[in-house]
Every structure is written in structure tokens, then in C-alpha cells.
């Protein structure tokens, strides 16, 4: 008997948690800044923590105006073969505005992985440090 199918269970559970099982996104609070994570990548970029506080929902960040440290996890390939993040990254930004909408976009150049923070007009306002990858 092969154990290979059993190795897929944690990954499948994570995919279920992050997809339809997670429910609809909450409505954005106009007193907070909302940060989407770009879904069009072949990798899954997930929200991990804000200012060191872990998040319950990895699909978005919502922060008060001002300076914050966002921590992200990246599952490369998003093929369900791993429930552990392949890379961890962080982005510091001091200009979050109430009611502002931002988007985090993962970018890879060879082995280097990072994320750019874009404002509502699509302009880059911050860049993460290079991610730490396994």
C-alpha cells in the first residue's frame, strides 16, 4: 500500500478551507484600509499576520490607517501537494489610508520572490523584502 494518497489530505484540506468553504469576504470597513491578495498568480499568496498578530482569514488584510507590517505566506504551485508555506515574506508600509483599497501582487524573478503593494490606481506604493523560501 502506498502512502502517497495520504500525503494529499493536508493539502486538500487547505484548498477546501481557502476556497468555497471559507465563505464570502466580509464587507470592507470604510474606516480601515483593505488589502486584497492578487488571485491571478499560479501561486497562492496568503495573509498571515498584521503587526505580529495572526489572522483568521488568509484571503485579505484589513488595517487601521497608518503604519503596519504585513506578513504573507506563499504556497508555490498551489497544487495541493503541501500544506506548509514554501515562502514567507513581509512588507512594511506607513501610508495606509482609511477607505483605501490596495492589492498585494506576488512577483518572482528566478529564485527570488517578493510582493508589491499597489494602490487603487495600480501604482506601486511599496515593495516587500525578499521572501524567505524553503
Where are these regions (language model features)?
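Short loop/turn and low-complexity linker motifs enriched in small/turn-promoting residues
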Residues: 21-134
